[in-house]
A protein has these predicted regions:
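Canonical Rossmann dinucleotide-binding motif of NAD(H)/NADP(H)-dependent dehydrogenases/reductases
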Residues: 2-38
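Catalytic loop of short-chain dehydrogenase/reductase
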Residues: 14-24, 93-131, 136-177, 189-192, ...
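Conserved mid-core segment of classical short-chain dehydrogenase/reductases
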Residues: 51-55, 61-72, 76-80, 87-113, ...
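C-terminal helical subdomain
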Residues: 121, 184, 203-239, 244-248
Length: 255
């Protein structure tokens, strides 16, 4: 029996550690029949080392999503490797330390701009860089963290994720005519490298311990990875502009 991504060609960003959603997405995608290519920044060697733990060998290319030269040559590099693309996974987010950890009111605009560029605008710029390879349509899937609420310590990453969610909706509107879907997976907190860089992450994670209807495991990125893979597949052919919550159900619970 073939997998749900059999014959698909997928570009995946953000594979830094085995604890990341991106790594588990890559692993599951290969297991479901996809050919994948990974991007890395700022240390491609780190991603190359982690990539060796995937079921099959895969190429890693350097990509800084804020660098126009990197974006400009992306389609040529990926095209030579895979011939085209059927899916893109955006697993990129960053904010300077002074934009996190309770410093919301004192964060300078330069740091806010960095968070917005890397975490939100890059969804558009990455997709547009890949667009020449998606002649037969495809699926773009990004990762968010529920931007409806003001979370402890999350500060300017909250507005950045809100911008990401709005960007995804507008992309869904504008790319639908090319049969390209754009959706997000909103995952609960995980003990990834990115999460651990947030001051006071434990306070944020404790919300899930007390309120999540389904038991939430901070050490298990696979449920979120499964959500991403499902959206990359043909099982959601008419779903776009959507946010699929993989958070143990916490988004549905009131105070």
């Amino acid at each position: 029996m073939s997998g749900i991504l059999e014959g698909k060609r997928i570009l995946i960003t953000g594979v830094l550690t085995e604890s990341s959603i991106a790594f588990h997405t890559a692993k599951l995608a290969q297991e479901q029949g996809a050919e994948i290519i990974l991007t890395a920044f700022p240390r491609p060697t780190l991603t190359e080392r982690i990539a060796k733990k995937l079921p099959k060998p895969t190429k890693v290319i350097e990509l800084d999503v804020t660098n126009d030269e990197h974006l400009g040559r992306l389609a040529d590099i990926v095209g030579e490797e895979l011939g085209g693309l059927d899916g893109v996974v955006h697993s990129i987010g960053f904010a300077p330390q002074d934009a996190l950890g309770g410093n919301f009111l004192n964060t300078p605009f330069e740091s806010v701009a960095t968070a917005m560029h890397v975490s939100a605008y890059s969804l558009k710029s990455l997709t547009m860089a890949c667009l020449p390879l998606m002649q037969n349509g495809g699926s773009v899937v990004g990762l968010t963290f529920d931007a409806q609420f003001a979370w402890p310590q999350y500060d300017w990453m909250g507005p950045a994720k809100a911008a990401l969610e709005a960007t995804s909706r507008y992309m869904a509107r504008d790319l639908g005519k090319q049969n390209i879907r754009c959706n997000l997976v909103s995952a609960g907190p995980l003990g990834s490298m990115a999460a651990k860089s947030i001051p006071g992450f434990g306070e944020l994670a404790s919300v899930w311990d007390s309120r999540s209807p389904l038991e939430w495991d901070l050490k298990d990125p696979e449920p979120a990875g499964r959500g991403v893979v499902a959206l990359l597949s043909d099982w959601f052919p008419k779903t776009t502009g959507e946010i699929v919550h993989v958070d143990g159900g916490l988004h549905a619970i009131g105070a």
